[in-house]
Structures are given as C-alpha cells and as structure tokens.
C-alpha cells in the first residue's frame, strides 16, 4: 500500500488493524524500556533545536506554495465561471468555480453546520472544505458520525501526532493511516525506541499544536521535486519511486510538518477536540521481517471529550474479552514460535472447533451440500490456470518436488473446479453444492500474525455452488437463509451490502446485469435491510458482503457470498443443457458462513467473554462431591455423563471446601455444577446449580442427562435458565 493509499480516508479502514487483536506487533504495547536519550520516567522532551530537515523542508515548501497560490489566483481570475452546486435534498446553490469552497457554502446554510462539518464530499469523493470547487457538482457535508468523516478526522489527527513525533524524536516518518478505531504513525529511529513514558510529553505537544489551529494546506508537486524535498527520508523516497506512478502527487502541511498524502483533511488542527496516545509497538517496514524495524505509536481522537471517556470504557471491556487472554486462561489454545501463525488447539479448544464444524456439517445435510476431501498440495500449473499464481503467489507456500513447482493450497475453489471437470456434467446435476473443510495455508507476513484473527494455517466452512444462470436467485436465497440460521444461534445481528459491477470488470455486461438483478431479488425476498455498494464488486462477479455485530458493538466480516463468472471460463467448465447444448458454462457461487473457523472462534470467544453457551461449551458439567465418602459415587456420575457425550469434569481436591469447589467451577464457567452428597448417593440423584448460582435442585441422573441432551441438541442460548 502506498503512502497515499495507506493514509487515504477512502482506503478501507481496518486493513492495518483488525477489530479483534492488535496487528503487526512484535513488542509489548506501552513498552516500559528506558530510552537511551530519554529522561527517565518523564520520557523525552521536545528537541531544541529541531532537526535541520524540518526547516529545510519548510523553506522549500513555502517557495512552492507561493508559486502555486499565484497560479491559482491567476486561474481563478481567468477561468472562474458560475456553477451549480446540488445539495442532498436536491436544492441548488450558485457558486463560482475556482473560488467558492464547500466551507463557504456550509456557512451560507448555517454557521452551526459549518462548525460541525468534518469534511465535504464532492461528486461522491471526499474533498477538503477549503479547496475551491472546479465545476458543477453534487455536495455533501459530512459530520463525525459518518465513517468517511471519522477516517478523515483520524487521518488529520495522525498528522498532528506525526508533527509531535518529529519534534520529539527527530526520526523519519513512514506510514500514518487512520485505522478501525483511531490512527497510528510509524517512525524510523537510528537509535533508541519509544517508551510509554514519552506519551505525556507527546500529548502535551499535540495539545499545543491543536491550540495553534494550524491550517491543513494541500499542494500538488512534481515527483522529482518531492524526491529532493524528502531526500533525508529513505522511506518517503521508496514510496515515491516504487508506488507513485504519476508525474505529480500531493503533500499536506500543518505547521512545520509536510508529508506525502492524498488527503483530504479537516480545516485546521483546532478541529481535533481531544486526543489520546494509548499504545506503542515495534513493527517492520511494510510488515516484512527482513526490512527495517520501525516504532509505531497509536492514538485516538474525538470531537467531544465524553466520547473519549466512552471509548476508554469500551477498551477496558475489549481488553477483558481478548480471545488470546481467555484462550490462555481457559486452556483452549496457544501458539508457539516453532510454528508461527499455526494454532495449537488443546482438548477443550478442539471441542469448540469440532463442534462448530459438526454444526455446519449437520446443516449441510439438510441443505443439499455434499462434503468432499481434496488435496493440500497442487502443481503450480493449477494456480496458473486459476490466475492465483499471477496475483497471489507471494502469499503461497511453494516448494520444488522432482524439479516441478508445487504449493500448499490457500483456497479450495480451483480444486473444486477439477472435481466438477473430472467427468461430463448434465443440467440434471445442477445446482451442485460442494463443501470442503480442507486445511488451507497462506503465507502471511510474520509481523501481521495476530492471535486467531491472522494466521497461516486455518480451515473454512468453504463451499462452492455450481449452478445455471437462472438458478442464481434460489441459491442465493438458500445461502442467506443458511447464514441467518447460524448467526441467530450465535446471537449475532448482521448487516448486508450488495456490491455491484466495478469499472474494470470482466465478462458480458448483460450477464452482470442479470446476475445483479437476481441478487437484488434474493435480498428483497430475504426480508432483512440491505444497502447497495455500487461499483464495489470483484472484477469477476458481484457479491453480498455480510458483517456480524458482536456483544460490544464491533462489526466483523466472516460470511462470503460471491458470484464468479471467470473461474468457469479459466477452467473451461461446461455442462450439457436440457436442450442438448454441451457448451453451457456454469456460474460458481463462493460461499462461507463461519469463514475461517479460527477467526470465528476468536470472535465467539470475545463475544461471549469466555462464557460459552451450553452446546458449545468445553466445560459443560462439573461433578462436586461433598466429601471423600462420596468420591466413588461422584466418579460413577462423571462416567455416566461422559458416556452421554458431555464435557464433564470432577473436583476431588480434598483441600477445598464444598463452597470453594462450587465457586471455582462457576469462575471456570462450567454451565452446570452437580453436587453429590450422602443423600444423592443413596437416592441415585444429583443436586443441580448453574454457573450463575441458580439452584435447580435434586434430579435423577437419567432425567438430568435427558434434559441436558435436549438443551444441547436445540443449541439453546440460555440453557441454564431453561433447564
């Protein structure tokens, strides 16, 4: 990703940092190590004098800006003409090209609107509020609540922090994008590092920069001039040489900071009302472990201090729910440096993993999917045919076998195409629904590996539907019903987006139109709200994007419903139609509900906070004897529940009191605690209570097993209450 792309608010937020986990870190956040140049617990102070490159860069910029302003003034005088600006309600406002700005139009409506507007949107593209309009256009004025406005707000905040970092550390700034919640900036330091002790002085300097209301200025400059301007910074020069393919690109200035950036930005630094620096880590240049080590600092900002308080509360809750912490505490899974990005699932974690797969497998039988098993290793010729070798080979594990190049599969679809093609196919076989839980490997950069959310080895509930064009609508309806069934059992709400034909698409436009219409019909019949995402489909077919919402309000994308017109062409897949045409091409629907099973386990762990629903719980039953005389009976009870296929344990610790044993079981999130004493031993019963201390009383063993089996089979979300 280029500097412009990485810093652009139009770039997809969250690419650098996922909602679950931190991303690309190899040093504990907020490292306490003392810097060589540091000032003890007080951290670093602002450099005096500033690094020489700041003044040299500013002198060069000022000269270029004066020339630019002169040209712009001349253009405004010479080329300005009346234009019409159309607002969202259809009202038109008169303006002058090269003179009138979105901010002036906002002021004309109301000063309150102008003050609360973060950024403009001109002809659907984000635009600086103080940048003159150039032609007839549509205009939207976005407030902080809008996602694109948030990205701009956090992007501008990153520049404020970047200015402070230059003035405190004097290093070379690298990337500084907005992310899912906030922003970060990377910096290369010749010596020393960043300490959490520095945060206070950085924040103080950021507040000073904000108070100064430094204007954000945009300037388009020739590439060769920028190479001279940034000659002190090898990273900016790399970006210019390797990523910028145009004769000119843009820089933005606030105060003494000038940085490569596509923009846009808020009007001035004073628009950032509250800013907090909350974390640091180290990372590698572009995530590659053989490149330079960089220091990364994370921040967050808001237009209202109350929002920061809410964010801090949310962060504390998210920290307590971190799947890596819960995974360790509950002995579910772990990672090891000898196999980075490949999870070790312990017995209780494996139970969750296998239960999820069996859940999907049971739905497959109801819905006409046929499960298959396919190879893990393929000759590279397969990936050349599919097109993955050209675009994805860097992310594949490849190796030589008998002088031929092979690779571990990163996805199942090409193998399923070979399956479809291994014999002639008839229209009577369609739709053919092929499901595969095969192990996949993707060569993620080591710096990007994050818990279960970014791994190298994983499995998906992957399926491909081979169907005729006219069958798309019904198949999509089936996929949508499938995901609603699964997500309702998990307790997730979700939102849907239809992403349609992009500008650069492959195939016949009529085929696209017909397919998109069928997707629309399916979504309308589904009955849930959905939004149109025009032009955001893949080049090979339209798709439905599904985002689930977890217990603390975060959104995650797991499910996939993607049409593919190109893979059948690349593999020359055909079927004989009912009228005898043996050259008919199927459409492929790529479909997953859980997505990566590993990632879904991370999301579920955090969603439930480790408090697993009974059917999925790795700790369903704990048997607690009142005393040693009941141990033998307790063992028999445990064996009966084990034989009934429950996850059951027993606490025979003689050093613990009964109350302590019960409390330990509740804290360990055992759904049901079965207490057995002399009375229960005599009558062949158990005394039942739940992890939330709801007492259900005495029941026979057979009665208890039967009821728990019913609750398990129904996948009840509240089994403890419903018992």
From Swiss-Prot:
Where found?
Cytoplasm
UniProt lists compositionally biased (Polar residues) regions at 1-10
Please give the residue positions where the record annotates the modification Phosphotyrosine. Answer: 298
Q: How is it modified after translation?
A: ISGylated.
Q: What is its EC number?
A: 6.1.1.3
Q: Where is the composition biased (Basic and acidic residues)?
A: 13-39
Q: Give the UniProt keywords, A-Z.
A: Acetylation, Aminoacyl-tRNA synthetase, ATP-binding, Cytoplasm, Ligase, Nucleotide-binding, Phosphoprotein, Protein biosynthesis, Ubl conjugation
A Pfam family it matches: tRNA-synt_2b
Per UniProt, subunit arrangement is: Homodimer.
- Tell me what this protein is called: Threonine--tRNA ligase 1, cytoplasmic
State the organism named in the record.
Bos taurus
